[in-house]
């Protein structure tokens, strides 16, 4: 009887282990392309510095997640769409891009890249932000 229970236990263990291995699959993600420019980053350099750190001799490339949010009560543009990283405003979609999304509630989190922020003996570069989206439709 003990041999039957032992064999039965081994069979169950084998089934569990083979199912576990079948569930594991390799997911190959294509790299994110940061092609979508935003505007207004110059006004938010202090916030970008808090996120990316102080300027260094070479440009920085910091991958982050950004929140893209409608801002219908914006005093300057009722269609404004704000970009936040770590809860800090870092810029906006351009007026033309925001106008294309007018009337839609936008609240998405997307990959983003903070780039620039160099300081050397000859020049200094501001931080910029690019979103990892291919089109505005990804925000709807």
Write out the residue ranges for each language-model feature.
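Conserved active-site motif detector
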Residues: 2-140
């Amino acid at each position: 009887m003990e041999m039957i229970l032992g064999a039965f236990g081994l069979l169950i263990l084998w089934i569990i282990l083979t199912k576990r291995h079948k569930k594991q699959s390799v997911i190959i993600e294509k790299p994110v392309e940061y092609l979508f420019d935003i505007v207004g980053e110059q006004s938010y350099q202090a916030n970008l510095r808090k996120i990316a750190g102080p300027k260094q001799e070479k440009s920085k490339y910091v991958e982050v997640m950004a929140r893209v949010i409608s801002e219908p009560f914006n005093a300057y543009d009722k269609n404004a769409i704000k970009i936040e990283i770590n809860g800090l405003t870092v810029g906006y979609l351009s007026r033309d891009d925001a106008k294309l999304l007018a009337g839609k509630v936008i609240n998405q989190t997307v990959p983003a890249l903070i780039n620039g922020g160099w300081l050397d003996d000859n020049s200094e570069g501001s931080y910029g932000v690019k979103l990892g989206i291919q089109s505005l439709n990804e925000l709807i």
